[in-house]
């Protein structure tokens, strides 16, 4: 629409403004249009590969206000990083303000795709309004909600570069799209039942289920105990009724996921509060537009109601609906109530929602792929015809009982990717390919690092192919050819081999970064720190500079340099990698180190391999040494009888953490009266406290700065109460690590300590050690924007490569 013609004014000024950041797909052009109209400005706004370009003409005062409000009043999903400005010649006949077609210049891309967001309250109100033309339409969205990253092929962000391109808008949708006063003004995924994507339900044989409402029939099947594959934003879920133990057991059997915990989806906070402890931080996370899976401390009775969902664990993964389709499932189960009132009330439907990634392969995204890979698992398929362009799992986080800044990522993916992490310096573009487990990749542009969504474990060809796809997608949307390629030291990782191939193909240097150096560097990178730091890297395994298996390290990290200052006592791994899956083997290794190898067979009578393991240890055959902290957790679990073998990675440590938490709730008779340390009164996310006492004289630090926890395991070997032993293990470990770190700080004079590695996913360890060291006056940096585990090391590899790059 044209503005009324204004009189020409010799004091009229025209400027060109370039806005950089997350400014495409978030309603930024409509926002600029409305703002310019309000201020009486003439000109135009358009997307280009670098962000948003604006030419505006009017009074100097109006232009000053425009610049100020571009930042101050930007749409909620936008992020304005930079505003550039230059003067232009005023146009004599300038009149009106318009949104122009997007431009593709030869300039480098400087914008980013927005992240996928949960359906907004305005769209929900329409979704449940029988008088609205989008009533119960599973693809409702607007400029403030809906898919972005997972349906975008390239920039600039226009319908033609998304998977909505095959769906031309009908006249009513076009009218909304072109109406400046409408919240769907230039909403690229805009659609309705007449012109947009649609649903279909298929049976187990892949044949359409005719003459049914797909939503109603899906809910009926779920309530009958069936398993339904449901197509979402970044891939398929496998869903079943969490209350139905038989359905959960069938899902475990068919997916071959024996004990690994499932997440559940509930309708709202009121329902979530029935099953988990929710503080202000958890509530904010559950209802955030990113809609991650949030780990909640289970309430009493959860395991009885949800048998087999998260067996033996203290935490339950919970998420709220984030797509209209998911909301419609709960709406149907509630009897199709009008309005939004029902969303404030507890609802009975609770769904297991697990990623459809059979065999540990990548998440299923396509309809044909689902029919091939999920046949025999799903009893039905709820599909739609909007293509998923970017595979993206649900994110998993844990709150800290406080508001949103205190968040620990366990998996960073949907909702947070591809949000950039600001670096403290610019440099050449670096591509880092991460490690072999929980893989992510990272690509830099100037002072921004773009970490991909979770790729997975590179133990199969399909996941390796997914890594290649992730690299290609980041390069395509950022239009960058890296000048350096970074990778892990391990020569047998696919990520390492592929990094070498890419470096050779592009004729650029390849930079090898030691695994634990990368863990610490990742945290330094996200905190923007260039200063030397003491790194405490605790995880399962990573190849060390000496070719040995590391995993319990004290490091001095100074830019691109890293020096090993100390490590945990090395334990043998009888049977090699098998010891990492069978905690009884690590317990046997500990017994042998105590000089009690003769007890191994009697201690583990159910393990037919016990005699052989005893011989391995005695003869030092197939028992490589490792300083891994993870293996000390396994040894403790094995000695306490918590777990002799594991069904999934980290299970023993997670069960041990749960036992320790449970001991904190019980009366304390029998606890030792003489203690070296106490972790009493530490707040928990659910509002209770965790209390445990450290054992005295339960560790040693030798002249070479090796921390020996064998005395702790000796004490645990005689413990008859597993929960008490687990609590003592955690409390003593925190005390030992505190003493070890403080002694190293005193020697080096470096007073910044950085935590890195998967062991810091342990809530008790991470929170209490952080508090202890902070009380000593030390600065403690922890992972906040990425997981502390291998999901973050690609960023660390990037940071080290940048530090080593010539200025």
Swiss-Prot record:
Pfam families named among the record's database cross-references: Acylphosphatase, HypF_C, HypF_C_2, Sua5_yciO_yrdC, zf-HYPF
Coiled-coil region list: none
Keywords from the named record: Ligase, Metal-binding, Plasmid, Zinc, Zinc-finger
Signal in keyword set: no
Domain of life, source organism: Bacteria
Domain annotation YrdC-like: ranges: 212-415
Residues of the Acylphosphatase-like domain: 14-101
Chain residue ranges for the region called Disordered: 663-682
Biological processes per GO annotation: protein maturation
GO molecular function: carboxyl- or carbamoyltransferase activity; double-stranded RNA binding; ligase activity; zinc ion binding
Recorded metabolic or biological pathway in which this protein acts: Protein modification; [NiFe] hydrogenase maturation
EC number of this enzyme: 6.2.-.-
InterPro entries: Acylphosphatase-like_dom, Acylphosphatase-like_dom_sf, Acylphosphatase_CS, Carbamoyltrans_HypF-like, Carbamoyltransferase_HypF, DHBP_synth_RibB-like_a/b_dom, HypF_C, HypF_C_2
Reactions this protein catalyses: C-terminal L-cysteinyl-[HypE protein] + carbamoyl phosphate + ATP + H2O = C-terminal S-carboxamide-L-cysteinyl-[HypE protein] + AMP + phosphate + diphosphate + H(+)
Zinc finger (C4-type): 120-145, 170-195
PANTHER family (alphabetical): CARBAMOYLTRANSFERASE, CARBAMOYLTRANSFERASE HYPF
Known role: Involved in the maturation of [NiFe] hydrogenases. Along with HypE, it catalyzes the synthesis of the CN ligands of the active site iron of [NiFe]-hydrogenases. HypF functions as a carbamoyl transferase using carbamoylphosphate as a substrate and transferring the carboxamido moiety in an ATP-dependent reaction to the thiolate of the C-terminal cysteine of HypE yielding a protein-S-carboxamide.
Family, similarity comment: Belongs to the carbamoyltransferase HypF family.
NCBIfam families per record: hypF
Protein name: Carbamoyltransferase HypF2
Species this protein is from: Cupriavidus necator (strain ATCC 17699 / DSM 428 / KCTC 22496 / NCIMB 10442 / H16 / Stanier 337) (Ralstonia eutropha)
Source organism phylogeny: Bacteria, Pseudomonadati, Pseudomonadota, Betaproteobacteria, Burkholderiales
């Amino acid at each position: 629409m044209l503005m009324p013609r204004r009189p020409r004014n010799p004091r009229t000024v025209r400027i060109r403004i370039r806005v950089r950041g997350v400014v495409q797909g978030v309603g930024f052009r409509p926002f600029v249009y409305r703002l310019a109209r309000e201020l009486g400005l003439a000109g135009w706004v358009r997307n280009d590969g670098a962000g948003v370009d604006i030419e505006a003409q009017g009074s100097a005062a109006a232009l000053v206000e425009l610049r100020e409000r571009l930042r101050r009043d930007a749409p909620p999903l936008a992020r304005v990083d930079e505003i550039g400005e230059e003067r232009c010649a005023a146009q004599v006949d300038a009149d009106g303000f318009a949104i122009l077609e997007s431009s593709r210049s030869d300039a480098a891309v400087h914008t980013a795709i927005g992240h996928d967001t949960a359906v907004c309250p305005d769209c929900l109100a329409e979704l449940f309004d029988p008088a609205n033309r989008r009533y119960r339409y599973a693809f409702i969205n607007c400029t403030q909600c809906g898919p972005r990253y997972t349906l975008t092929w390239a920039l600039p962000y226009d319908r033609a570069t998304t998977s909505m391109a095959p769906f031309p808008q009908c006249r009513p949708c076009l009218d909304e799209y072109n109406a400046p006063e409408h919240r769907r003004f230039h909403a690229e995924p805009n659609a309705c039942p007449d012109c947009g994507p649609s649903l279909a339900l298929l049976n187990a044989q892949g044949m359409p289920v005719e003459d049914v409402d797909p939503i109603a029939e899906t809910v009926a099947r779920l309530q009958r105990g069936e398993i339904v594959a449901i197509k979402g934003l970044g891939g398929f879920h496998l869903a079943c009724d969490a209350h139905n133990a038989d359905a959960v057991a069938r899902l475990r059997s068919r997916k071959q996921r024996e004990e690994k915990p499932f997440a559940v989806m509930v309708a709202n906070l009121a329902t979530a509060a029935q099953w988990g402890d929710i503080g202000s931080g958890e509530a904010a996370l559950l209802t955030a537009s990113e809609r991650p899976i949030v780990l909640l401390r289970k309430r009493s009775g959860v395991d009885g109601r949800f048998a087999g969902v998260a067996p033996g664990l203290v935490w339950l993964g919970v998420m709220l609906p984030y797509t209209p389709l998911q909301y419609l499932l709960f709406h149907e189960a509630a009897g199709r109530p009008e309005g939004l009132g029902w969303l404030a009330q507890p609802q009975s439907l609770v769904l297991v929602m697990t990623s459809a990634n059979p065999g540990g392969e990548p998440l299923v995204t396509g309809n044909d792929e689902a029919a091939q890979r999920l046949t025999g698992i799903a009893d039905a398929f709820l599909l739609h015809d909007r293509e998923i362009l970017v595979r993206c799992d649900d994110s998993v986080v844990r709150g800290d009982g406080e508001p949103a800044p205190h968040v620990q990522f366990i998996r960073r993916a949907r909702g947070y990717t591809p949000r950039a992490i600001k670096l403290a310096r610019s440099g050449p573009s670096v591509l880092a390919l991460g490690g072999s487990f929980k893989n992510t990749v990272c690509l830099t542009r100037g002072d921004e690092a773009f970490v991909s969504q979770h790729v997975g474990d590179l133990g199969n060809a399909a996941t390796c192919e997914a890594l290649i796809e992730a690299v290609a997608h980041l390069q395509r949307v950022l239009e960058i050819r890296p000048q350096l390629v970074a990778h892990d030291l391990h020569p047998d990782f696919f990520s390492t081999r592929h990094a070498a191939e890419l470096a050779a193909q592009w004729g650029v240097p390849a930079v090898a970064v030691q695994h634990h150096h990368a863990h610490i560097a990742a945290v330094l990178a996200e905190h923007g720190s260039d200063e030397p730091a003491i790194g405490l890297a605790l995880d399962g395994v990573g190849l060390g500079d000496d070719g040995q298996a590391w995993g319990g390290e004290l490091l001095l990290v100074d830019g691109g340099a890293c020096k090993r200052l100390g490590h945990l006592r090395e334990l043998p791994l009888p049977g090699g990698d098998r010891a990492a899956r069978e905690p009884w083997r690590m317990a046997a290794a500990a017994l042998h180190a105590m000089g009690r190898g003769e007890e191994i067979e009697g201690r583990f009578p159910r393990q037919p391999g016990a005699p052989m393991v005893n011989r391995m240890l005695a003869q030092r055959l197939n028992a490589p040494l490792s300083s891994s902290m993870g293996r000390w957790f396994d040894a403790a679990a094995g000695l306490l009888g918590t777990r002799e073998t594991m069904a999934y990675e980290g299970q023993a440590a997670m069960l041990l953490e749960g036992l320790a938490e449970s001991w904190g709730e019980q009366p304390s008779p029998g606890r030792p009266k003489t203690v070296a340390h106490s972790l009493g009164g530490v707040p928990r996310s659910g509002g209770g406290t965790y209390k445990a006492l450290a054992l005295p004289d339960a560790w040693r630090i030798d002249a070479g700065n090796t921390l020996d926890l064998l005395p702790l395991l000796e004490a645990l070997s005689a413990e008859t109460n597993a929960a008490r032993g687990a609590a003592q293990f955690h409390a003593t470990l925190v005390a030992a690590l505190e003493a070890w770190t403080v002694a190293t700080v005193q020697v080096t004079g470096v007073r910044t300590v950085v935590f890195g590695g998967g062991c810091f996913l342990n809530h008790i360890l991470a929170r209490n050690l952080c508090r202890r060291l902070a009380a000593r006056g030390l600065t403690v940096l922890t992972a906040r924007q990425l997981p502390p585990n291998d999901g973050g090391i690609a960023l660390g590899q990037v940071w080290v490569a940048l530090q080593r790059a010539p200025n």
